[in-house]
């Protein structure tokens, strides 16, 4: 008697790392969150209980934009000391937690890393991004909200090219938001994408409705889009 054919394997969901302020386990996100690592405090703070809304808002936008179910692993990096009065959370004065979060995400073999932060051009972060991108991981980063004619996070974008992407924000009419750091006239050596980033509907950590503006909130839309692309081949690192 012939054996019955085996049922096809269930496709594995894309695993996405969100390096941010931590993510709340809201009813909408609960079935997508698989783990949270706290690189901003020792001992680690309680998982999925963020101080700030930012990471939850980013994760919600990404989940809504994804064409198929995804798994999200949260990397919480916000400083225990909070933010200066003139800064928007999440803040982290030390580059080490951010670099370590990128390396942990790389070790987990995630499909993409979402970084809706304005990072310091520190060699530890640049090297961590380069290594992630060399392993075929898409690293998607905010271009920044300073209204400049060049993007932030540029060193990282060049280091991981072509698997790193900077994202600027468009308004609902498709025009660049006034606060976006725009690509240079000659954008050779890095990728820059535009996505909706003005008054984007989302959810705060307490589950309440909100709208969000800034390149931070354009990034998860681009990340979700890139999840449908084939994973690129790894890149040989030069010695």
List each language-model region with its residue ranges.
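Active-site core segment of subtilase-fold serine proteases
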Residues: 2-93, 97-100, 104-108, 112, ...
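Solvent-exposed loop/turn segments at secondary-structure junctions
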Residues: 22-25, 68, 78-82, 118-122, ...
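Glycine-rich, phosphate-binding/catalytic loops in enzymes
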Residues: 28, 32-37, 129-133, 156-159, ...
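An often Trp-containing, charged/polar helix-loop segment at the C-terminal end
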Residues: 231-239
């Amino acid at each position: 008697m012939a054996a019955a054919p085996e049922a096809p394997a269930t496709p594995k969901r894309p695993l996405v790392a969100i390096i941010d302020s931590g993510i709340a386990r809201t009813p909408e996100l609960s079935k997508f969150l698989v783990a949270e690592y706290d690189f901003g405090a020792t001992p680690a703070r309680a998982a999925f209980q963020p101080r700030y809304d930012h990471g939850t808002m980013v994760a919600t936008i990404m989940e809504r934009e994804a064409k198929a179910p995804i798994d999200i692993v949260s990397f919480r990096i916000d400083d225990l000391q909070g933010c200066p009065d003139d800064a928007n959370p999440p803040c982290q004065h030390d580059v080490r937690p951010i670099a370590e979060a990128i390396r942990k995400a790389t070790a987990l073999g995630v499909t993409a890393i979402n970084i809706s932060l304005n990072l310091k051009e520190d060699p530890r972060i640049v090297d961590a991004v380069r290594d992630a991108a060399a392993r075929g991981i898409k690293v998607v980063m905010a271009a920044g909200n300073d209204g400049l004619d060049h993007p932030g996070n540029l060193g990282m974008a060049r280091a991981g090219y072509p698997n790193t992407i900077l994202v600027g924000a468009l308004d609902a009419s498709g025009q660049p938001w006034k606060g976006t750091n725009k690509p240079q006239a000659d954008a050779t050596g890095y990728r820059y994408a535009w996505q909706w980033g003005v008054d984007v509907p989302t959810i705060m950590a307490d589950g309440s409705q909100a709208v969000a503006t800034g390149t931070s909130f354009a990034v998860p839309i681009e990340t979700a889009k890139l999840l449908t692309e084939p994973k690129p081949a790894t890149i040989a690192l030069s010695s």
